[in-house]
Amino acid sequence: DTDPGQILAVFANLASDSPKNGFTIGITDDVTGLSLPSLPYSGDASGVFSCKFWGLGGDGTVGANKNTVHIVSDLSGMYGQAYFEYDAKKSFGVTKSHLRFGKAPVDSSYYVKKADFIACHNQTYIGQYDIVSELKEGGIFLLNCSRTGEELEAWLPDGVKRTLAPPPAAGSGPPAPPRVPPPR
């Protein structure tokens, strides 16, 4: 997936006093040293709500998200866009659904890098992938799991809890622990 930050790096290279004649983007090429580091990019246009869903191949996440884009677009009058990423295994491999919604046409030809909403439909992914770092500040994270609130508090990795914890108010001391909803 080539994203805008990588394209910005190409233009910055071309505008530099000594541009690299041959280069790579999207990878860190530690053998040739020809990689251009990706430049910061603020993300989607304003008014675009971006979502990322992590699923397991065959669990229905991708199919449900294909339907979601159609339903939201048809019933709300909003524009929708969806890209789907599949593991080579297909069944039982990792799937990622990248959805965007906006009041104007959504024209982002790359995967969601920072999302307003992230859902993880396979609880084992929390320990395997850095999912919550892709959440925008103030975003919503939904973990589909079978644990109670107390079990979840004990089970979640500390790094995940720190990322999801609300930022402390100025001068209020250490951050508060994350809020875990009570079991239903």
Indicate where each model-derived feature is located.
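Active-site cofactor/cluster-binding pocket
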Residues: 1, 45-57, 61-184
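Peripheral docking tails and interdomain loops at the edges
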Residues: 1-44, 170-171, 179, 184
